């Protein structure tokens, strides 16, 4: 007679062996082989099984144009389940780096229980063998018994998406994105955009700018965030364009950071020179999320977007010099093996303001430039760049903001002298701030303000000399132009006289 103790002993030994072999299999067998074996197993098992599998891809379209929001929400939901149940986890720093956030690692599975029903989530990665596309495609698979199909596809999935959204809002960390180079396809394994936490401290309160202009900017941004229904009513995509222009050091980048902090938006820093062509630019724009600011800094330098309708320059020699410089830069790029971007002006306009721009809402687009007159009018027209904001040199109102930020003072005996100088002298807020910043523990407000006064006086004298030199150069150019015109008129007169003599001689001959 078979004894119960022997049965239990046999069963326990068998289960222990199976658990051991399963652990070895998961730990040491490469995931490529595991994927293949598991696919074969599921196919065989599917003939006699009632299991259902639902696949959630990272990108919604076959060609990966737009990232799936459902995929991100499910990843958020699974992050809380993975910590306690998964064997392999991926650790990332959380907001403010105070703790770690654990999430499901690639090629790992985790169980979940909902209303007594057990389901299994697995994260897989598929890599194309096509050399032209070496990117990795991620997808999540939900597996469950067929008898629970209705409950899982309605109640459970609604629960997952709702919980994932709440977790995402709770753990949301604003990010600064930059586009990966089209030439570096391996970077695309993490998507078209790479990101780091956005932690810039700039605010409108600390921005060195005219108070009235700042308040107008804040009101404009608030109006935009509340304008979803209004934009739909008037038939426009929910986006707004800002053009920030002014000399270097006047706070254009700081303004963008202040806007992002004010709205609590992510920032996408789009580097056009690394974008392969117009098609790639569209994909990048589609892969940006709502509640974000897309920035193209120094757009006059990013690509040759200024020459299509460029105004004729005053001096031909300056134009020739610039053409020589451009040719030298192109030659240098070819020698380095760098590929030139094929993004065109029309391609950029279509990406930011064409049919494709309506694919995601609540988005702000910002261009910055040091030279407004260099830009093509089509690029900055009203309706495309709705708000043109001049970031000018530091005047007294902006100086008072900087003095409060750097020295924590709102009045001083030198303020009167400084007011006179900043109104007469063109100095950028960045240069003013550098003079106000204490260089040692001994530097107090008196020392810093005295240093600023001296710097302003030197800058004023320098500007005066430059103006005199420019005046002399202009006089020399005018003299050359008058001389050249006189020589041309003289040549023309001589030619007319020569033609007259020839005609006279021909008449005598006849």
Swiss-Prot record:
This is AAA-ATPase At3g28540. GO terms for cellular component: membrane. Belongs to the AAA ATPase family. BCS1 subfamily. It is found in: Membrane. GO terms for biological process: response to stress. InterPro entries: AAA+_ATPase, AAA_N_dom, ATPase_AAA_core, Mitochondrial_chaperone_BCS1, P-loop_NTPase. Residues 460-510 are annotated as: Disordered. It is a single-pass membrane protein. Its cofactor is Mg(2+). GO terms for molecular function: ATP binding; ATP hydrolysis activity. It holds the Pfam family AAA_assoc. ATP binds at residues 246-253. It catalyses: ATP + H2O = ADP + phosphate + H(+). The keyword Transport does not apply. The chain crosses the membrane at residues 7-25. Its EC number is 3.6.1.-. Keywords: ATP-binding, Hydrolase, Magnesium, Membrane, Nucleotide-binding, Transmembrane, Transmembrane helix. The keyword Repressor does not apply.
């Amino acid at each position: 007679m078979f004894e119960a103790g022997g049965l239990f002993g046999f069963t326990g030994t068998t289960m222990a062996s199976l658990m051991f072999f399963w652990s070895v299999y998961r730990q040491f067998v490469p995931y490529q082989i595991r994927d293949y074996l598991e696919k074969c197993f599921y196919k065989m098992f599917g003939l006699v099984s009632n299991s259902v599998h639902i696949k959630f891809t990272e990108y919604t379209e076959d060609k990966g144009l737009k990232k799936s929001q459902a995929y991100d929400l499910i990843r958020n939901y699974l992050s809380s389940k993975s910590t306690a149940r998964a064997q392999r986890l991926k650790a990332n720093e959380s907001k403010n780096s105070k703790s770690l956030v654990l999430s499901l690692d690639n090629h790992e599975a985790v169980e979940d229980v909902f209303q007594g029903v057990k389901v299994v989530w697995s994260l897989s990665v598929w890599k194309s063998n096509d050399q032209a596309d070496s990117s990795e495609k991620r997808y999540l698979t939900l597996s469950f018994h067929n008898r629970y199909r209705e409950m899982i596809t309605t109640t459970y999935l609604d629960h997952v998406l709702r919980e994932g959204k709440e977790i995402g809002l709770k753990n949301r960390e604003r990010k600064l994105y930059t586009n990966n180079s089209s030439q570096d396809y391996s970077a695309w394994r993490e998507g078209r955009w790479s990101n780091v936490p956005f932690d810039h401290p700039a605010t409108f309160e600390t921005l060195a700018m005219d108070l009235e202009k700042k308040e107008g900017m804040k009101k404009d941004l608030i109006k935009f965030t509340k304008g979803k229904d209004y934009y739909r009513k008037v038939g426009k995509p929910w986006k707004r364009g800002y053009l920030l222009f002014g000399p270097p050091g006047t706070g254009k980048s700081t303004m963008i950071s202040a806007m992002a902090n004010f709205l609590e938006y992510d920032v996408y820093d789009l580097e056009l020179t690394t974008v392969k062509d117009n098609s790639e630019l569209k994909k990048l724009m589609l892969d940006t999320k709502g509640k974000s600011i897309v920035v193209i800094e120094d757009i006059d330098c990013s690509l040759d977007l200024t020459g299509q309708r460029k105004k004729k320059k005053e001096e031909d020699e300056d134009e020739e010099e610039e053409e020589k410089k451009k040719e030298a830069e192109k030659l240098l790029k070819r020698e380095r093996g760098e590929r030139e971007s094929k993004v065109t002006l029309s391609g950029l306009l279509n990406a930011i303001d064409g049919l494709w721009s309506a694919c995601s809402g609540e988005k702000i687009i910002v261009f910055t430039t040091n030279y407004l007159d260099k830009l093509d009018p089509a690029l900055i027209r009203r309706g495309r760049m709705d708000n043109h904001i001049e970031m000018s040199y530091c005047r007294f109102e902006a100086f008072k903001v900087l003095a409060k930020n750097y020295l924590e003072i709102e009045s001083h005996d030198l303020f009167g002298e400084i007011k006179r100088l900043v109104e007469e002298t063109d100095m950028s807020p960045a240069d003013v701030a550098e003079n106000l910043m204490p260089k040692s523990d001994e530097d107090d407000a008196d020392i810093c303000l005295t240093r600023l006064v001296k710097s302003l006086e030197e800058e004023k004298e320098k500007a005066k000399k430059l103006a005199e030199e420019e005046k002399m150069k202009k006089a020399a150019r005018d003299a050359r132009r008058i001389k050249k015109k006189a020589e041309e008129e003289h040549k023309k007169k001589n030619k007319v006289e020569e033609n007259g003599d020839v005609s006279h001689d021909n008449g005598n001959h006849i």
